[in-house]
Amino acid sequence: THSIHSQYFVPDWDLAYMLTEEREGYNPRPVDQAAVFHAYKDYAVGFSTYSEGVNDDVNKIIWSMLGWDPDTKPIEILREYAGYFIGQDLAEGFAQGLLALERNWRGPLISNAGVDTTLQMFREMEKKASPQAKLRWRFQMALYRAYYDAYVRSRLLYETSLEDQAMEKLRQARNSGVTLALSEAEALLDRSLTNPVAQDLRARLYELAEALYQSVRAQLSVDKYQAISVGRGANLDTTDVPLNNRLWLKQRFAEIRSLPTESERLAAVDEIVNWTNPGPGGFYDDLGNLARQPHLVRGPGYPSDPAHLKSSYVNLGSTGYGPRRLPGVIHSQAASFEQEEMYPISWWSTA
């Protein structure tokens, strides 16, 4: 049912997804759901299916079908699901599309080019779909996810590049002067607002959100569709949450400008530039960045430990969207690291 803050959360979910798609977004996870079922089926007699809403529609079907026949393959269930609810002409494509949506959430988003392929799959299905199929909420919701994932990835690539360019301006502060370096860096960071990327994807998201409200009364926004709160499935309201350190950097820039001397301002800029530099002989692990955890002891992971009782667990801290440095993550247990003869060690997290 829930992607984070739950018993069987999405493993290794990218922070960009956590910040935008949130806890109760549409989350077809057929492979993960089957892994949970098979990990614990020998400890139970019988089964029941639990659901909190339409967002986990695929998962409850997977669970129910496995309860009847544990040997059924997830793809077989998805084909039957798609044929019954969407149409036999789209059954194979839609079933494969649901698997692709699950793969969209595997590992670092910035390097997951499959997200764009998934969107193309659903766009092709949309072209072929009958008018009746296009009105079915299950079809609309999968489309919404495909567009949402692609929009988040487009923004992540863009905003990461803008921050990289801004940091290069800060590295030149000793030559250009702090005032100019801050102004140029800030202008680059603000391009995410003045020249936003992938607005066609964003516009389509809003169209699909309206379609879902009309077809099944999906409440994807607090103001537009009267959702209880942003964290309760209203991820239309978080589509544009910053995916880089723009808010934190701009706050720091304001503080630096207030410092009385150039030497103090330069020292503060150096602190930002060298934030992830632990010094000679050290290493820096970022426990909220899936691509920067080489020393983290991950444990068995899926499928043998789907509840992460013995595995590392990265999740989103519920501290709001204020100007703080990303990532803001929590760990459900003490993090363990491989021992190496190199000190000091630096790592970033919020406990």
Would you name each region that the model predicts?
Residues 9-13, 62-67:
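Short secondary-structure boundary/capping segments
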Residues 8, 12-18, 22-34, 109, ...:
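Generic low-complexity segments that are intrinsically disordered, proline-rich and/or Lys/Arg-biased
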Residues 51-59, 71-293:
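C-terminal non-catalytic alpha-helical accessory regions
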Residues 1-55, 171-175, 187-193:
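Active-site core of glycosidic bond-cleaving carbohydrate-active enzymes
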Residues 9, 37, 47-50, 85, ...:
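Phenylalanine-focused residue identity feature
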Residues 266-350:
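Glycan-recognition and processing domains
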Residues 27, 61-62:
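General secondary-structure edge motif
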